[in-house]
Amino acid sequence: MYPYPNEIGRYGDFGGKFVPETLMQPLDEIQTAFKQIKDDPAFREEYYKLLKDYSGRPTALTYADRVTEYLGGAKIYLKREDLNHTGSHKINNALGQALLAKKMGKTKIIAETGAGQHGVAAATVAAKFGFSCTVFMGEEDVARQSLNVFRMKLLGAEVVPVTSGNGTLKDATNEAIRYWVQHCEDHFYMIGSVVGPHPYPQVVREFQKMIGEEAKDQLKRIEGTMPDKVVACVGGGSNAMGMFQAFLNEDVELIGAEAAGKGIDTPLHAATISKGTVGVIHGSLTYLIQDEFGQIIEPYSISAGLDYPGIGPEHAYLHKSGRVTYDSITDEEAVDALKLLSEKEGILPAIESAHALAKAFKLAKGMDRGQLILVCLSGRGDKDVNTLMNVLEEEVKAHV
């Protein structure tokens, strides 16, 4: 039986609750409320009804037959989280935490966002539940994800651009936590990934674990067996944790794909496992990208959802224990994988998801045709069209 987290929120050496005294009480309140609802049949019934009727679960498992044929190796299956309401896996967690907030009597939501997908999901569930919603987003991400910013505002959320640091996800998270410290009596902080202080990594994992559970059952029905390998992209790591959870006790190879940006031998990457060291970020002990003085080095990725300088503490444990292998994928490799899936399957994935696809495509080529790779397609790529147009401008112009 997989024993983590333990009673103090640790995953082996990692995790915990490294926060100012002012946050201990609100975190304890969330932990108590979460324990009460986690296995409560009435809560689970309400939650899964929302997932089915509002978000459209279960999501499909799609055999990528033309990509499989093109690569000539293992059969590639895609868990289609892009088909969720709002376009990614983020709605799974947002619905769960909104219900938790409701049970706690909170009616004001705070959220941070990078690619904007969690912000959109938070704004969506806030509208559904009649909550107010304030979303913190780095100004760099506001610029490159303008479509999602407009969506959040349409949904009634206030979007607060964060100008400190690099203007990306880390900075948005810092500001969201600062705001929560001052308003924790009536606000609920809806964190978007398996990061932060205990109990957040456990809460988010719980509200994402249906990804792997569904995929496992679907693949068994279709192929009659387990996958040989499971691949997911990793920033903070919530889609990966949701996918991996169902396979941790199975004889299945699990692989996380981090963002190598311009290359892990350059300063422009977000490869936390490959290049990071142990430290504390946003209340949790984990791996992070830092200098010799413990100062966080600003991460970089073409993907707004992966340029986070830390990683969820459970991923840190799974890396150290050897249970999960983590590799890094460059911007160029991710864009190439995105183009291949779009052209061969008619599916435009998010740039985040394209990191997982790139790793899966590399692996598939070296595997037998009878083997299976399961990939978490965490989101759709509509939000990335402006970025892609800039990156592929000359190529696109040639086709117009």
Curated annotation (Swiss-Prot):
InterPro entries: Trp_synth_b_CS (IPR006653), Trp_synth_beta (IPR006654), Trp_synth_beta/beta-like (IPR023026), TrpB-like_PALP (IPR001926), TrpB-like_PALP_sf (IPR036052). This is Tryptophan synthase beta chain. It comes from Bacillus subtilis (strain 168). One of its GO terms (molecular function) is tryptophan synthase activity. CDD domains: Trp-synth_B. One of its GO terms (biological process) is L-tryptophan biosynthetic process. The modification N6-(pyridoxal phosphate)lysine is found at residue 90. Tetramer of two alpha and two beta chains. It is an enzyme of class 4 (lyase). Belongs to the TrpB family. The keyword Amino-acid biosynthesis applies. The lineage of its organism: Bacteria, Bacillati, Bacillota, Bacilli, Bacillales. Pathway: Amino-acid biosynthesis; L-tryptophan biosynthesis; L-tryptophan from chorismate: step 5/5. Its cofactor is pyridoxal 5'-phosphate.
